[in-house]
Swiss-Prot record:
Superkingdom field: Bacteria
Record note on pH: Optimum pH is between 6.5 and 7.
Keywords recorded for this protein, A-Z: Cytoplasm, FAD, Flavoprotein, NAD, Oxidoreductase
Protein name from the UniProt record: Acryloyl-CoA reductase (NADH)
Gene: acrC
Thermal activity characteristics from the UniProt entry: In the range between 25 and 55 degrees Celsius, the activity increases with rising temperature. Above 55 degrees Celsius, it decreases and becomes almost zero at 65 degrees Celsius.
Assembly mode: Heterohexadecamer; tetramer of tetramers. Each tetramer is composed of 2 alpha (AcrC), a beta (AcrA) and a gamma (AcrB) subunit.
Catalytic residue positions: E377
Length: 394
């Protein structure tokens, strides 16, 4: 009986099935992706158009408030719910998956570190209000090296305002966001220990949008340069405490990497779906190419690696939701899922042959879109450093 009890408890802990609410969310996100995103995905990519109307619709059905309690306009849930929604979007429109995933960073940071007043002011706007959120850390000389940030936010004690000066680059949604979490040096001489997080609203005097980038992929996810020239924001907009900005940024990035993992498994699963359909329809030498062993091996490799990637992403999500350390697992899941997305979209394009190379078919777009998952929220190389450090800790 003792052994049987242990076995039952272990089986209970190893239950990977979704709850009823999570299944409903998955169905909702899948239907939204099929009805609202898939029909416009090619246009979004071709015209480099930010899907503003679709983002408003995401807010209307509660997807922009995932991870935020209902009292602040959110939908509740946690990281696994984010993975469910983002991966469904990734199957049909990677740009939209990226927009949702990156948007969620700002409200979750404000919910975790914000004051009561900040939560009441900004969270309803970022959830049910339909305003886009942005997270601005990267600078021209501060990519993987966050310690090289030069943007300053000096407190003017007479007006009780922070005065921001500096430039941020490659900020996803930066040109469209209504509420942004900016990382700047409040005490420049202290370096990383002098970095703080500050909430800045669109339209604040001294804050302007610079270059909007033309990218290889995820064209609908607008990426912009942010310029701060004597931009004054109330001291009350400080998120958390002074000098804690680097900690806030790194913790936010741990969660964001799971979001990128979700994007990557979504696009991989979408590429597999297209490939399976194609190999049954494509006739060569008098029979479907699905009968060819080489094609079967491709499909087997794609499906196996993607299933493993999903398992690692969902495990990292479980750890974050459970309040357990997850830095190593978030880096692992992002590294693995992103490299798998490139692998799968490459094989899927190969399976489609000449058709896959043409812009009339979605595979060439998916192939381009997949690459960014190996770069943003930390490159694959940086993640290997993070993983090695975590594994070798004593």
């Amino acid at each position: 009986m003792f052994l049987l009890k242990i076995k039952k408890e272990r089986m209970k802990r190893m239950d990977f099935s979704l709850t009823r609410e999570q299944e409903m969310l998955k169905k909702l996100a899948r239907q939204f992706a099929e009805i609202e995103l898939e029909p416009v995905a090619e246009e979004i990519d071709r015209e480099h158009v930010f899907p503003a109307e679709n983002f408003k619709k995401m807010a209307e059905i509660g997807l922009t408030g995932i991870g935020i309690p209902k009292e602040f306009g959110g939908s509740g849930g946690g990281t696994l719910e984010k993975v469910i929604a983002v991966s469904e979007f990734g199957k049909k429109c990677m740009a939209s998956a990226s927009i949702l995933s990156i948007h969620l960073i700002a409200p979750q940071a404000i919910y975790k570190y914000g004051t009561k007043e900040q939560k009441e002011t900004y969270l309803p706007r970022l959830t049910k209000g339909g305003e886009l959120g942005a997270f601005a850390l990267t600078e021209p000389n501060a990519g993987s090296d966050a310690g090289a940030v030069k943007t300053t936010a000096i407190l003017d004690s007479q007006t009780n305002e922070y005065v921001l000066n500096g430039t941020k680059c490659f900020i996803s949604g930066g040109g469209r966001a209504g509420v942004l979490v900016i990382f700047a040096l409040t005490e420049p001489k202290k370096g990383l220990k002098g970095m703080s997080a500050i909430i800045v609203e669109k339209g604040t005097p001294g804050f302007s949008i610079g270059k909007v980038e033309s990218k290889m992929g995820i064209a609908g996810s607008e990426t912009a340069e942010l310029i701060f020239e004597d931009c004054r924001v109330p001291a009350a907009n400080l998120l958390g405490k002074e000098g804690k900005g680097f900690k806030i940024a790194m913790e936010a990035l741990d969660g964001a990497r799971i979001g990128v993992g979700a994007q990557a498994i979504g696009i991989a699963e979408g590429a597999i779906d297209l490939s399976v359909k194609y190999v049954h329809e494509r006739i060569q030498f008098g029979k479907p190419i699905a009968n060819l062993q080489g094609i079967q091996w491709y499909i087997a490799d794609m499906a196996t690696k993607t299933a493993a990637a999903r398992a690692l992403v969902e495990f990292a999500a479980y750890l974050e939701d459970a309040g357990k350390p997850f830095t190593k697992e978030s880096a692992m899941c992002k590294l693995n899922a992103s490299e798998n997305a490139r692998f799968v979209t490459n094989l899927a394009l190969q399976i489609h042959g000449g058709y896959g190379y043409m812009k009339d078919y979605p595979l060439e777009r998916m192939y381009r879109d997949a690459k960014i998952t190996e770069i943003y929220e930390g490159t694959s190389e940086i993640h290997k450093v993070v993983i090695a450090r975590e594994v070798m800790k004593r």
